[in-house]
Amino acid sequence: MEKKFSGKIWKFGNDIDTDTIIPGKRGTIPDRNEMKKYAFELLKPEFGSTVQPGDILVAGTNFGCGSSREQAATVLSYNGVRCIIAKSFARIFFRNAFNSGILLLTCDQIQDVCEGGDIVTVDVDAQTVSVNGKTFKVGAVPENLYNIVANGGLIEDTKKRLAAGNVKMDIKPLSMEQCRKKGYTMVEKILKKNAGKEHVAPGDIVITKPDMFMIHDIYTTYLLETMKDIGADKIDDPDKVTIVWDHCMPTAVAKNDYDHYEAGLELAKTYGIKKLHIGEGICHTIMHEAKYAKPGEIATATDSHTTTYGGAGNFCSGIGTAEMAAALITGELWFKVPEAIKIVLNGHLRDGVMSKDVILRILGDIKADGGQYKSLEFTGPAAHEMSMEQRFTVANMALEAGAKCGLFEADEKTAEYYGMPLEDIDWVCVDDRSKV
């Protein structure tokens, strides 16, 4: 991939969500070359028929917000979009786009001096974008992400890794004593423990070995297709994986989405996955009821509301199917350490006031992108009075502020719920000496 290139601009505003990029009714089209024709069909109907390979999108804040729908990044990649320049990106779209081979750059000035049809020049090494005689600085691209784009996306990158012998990093988790070291936010503690790093800071890229992976039935067909494309005949640790049939059940079996049902069974048989839950309930509820997502650990799933498990102090975040496939094969997953917002819930919940009311008020205060790529960390008397189900409810909706995760402190209720000694998890707490 060239480090300097030019392309025609397609200009968009703020809060362009994944439903705008590809409407939900088009998201199940099995042929990506057919699906790509419907990109932006409700906003820019001409896009699908006139976009050219190498074109560049320029947008405002929170581009790619809403659902974790990986198809949004996929259709842009299949349409040949080379780069997206925006003021900010929704966190899951950010990952999905890089994994689809699209270069993302952050810049908050170019939007005011360009229009659709203008030609913009990108210089990766100089960290600049230029249009209409003006040049602006852009954020640096982490080396690991640039390499994914240069290799043609995560699938091709993973193929090359397998061909080279799938060499894994030697990651040794931190001891309990090291986890208790002062001066870190909850998310920093969990990430540094898993990554075996004695120190992490916001913006750092860390390689982790997640403790649990969850796949639900909407994405079983795409995941199976991706695994076959990569050529994987085994996964790193089948015992760390669960498949939940819930989004399409029971109609999937009855009439309309039988392929998703069968694909899940084929995934389980092919890769030795034993933790199967067919029509037993909502995937995010099963994750904590089955004790798959534990305090102080890392869980990830093919769904945006994976943040739910943060109610137990579990670092959890949604990813796309390409990234899930790569992570299942390698056992590894990168994360950018987020900044944190400490939210102190003082007082007590009055009769008739539910945890849903609390998070809705918080969302109203900080708005849809107020937690963009941040860890919302809850503490205070009202937080500790909440039941585990109430905490899961709050954490579930942290996503709606663009948050990377929503974490509650692990306390006596958490220990009782999981049947764990409190002293094993009490380090998952807000540290007043942390930079939050």
Protein language model regions, located:
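Fe-S-dependent hydro-lyases/dehydratases of central metabolism
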Residues: M1-V436
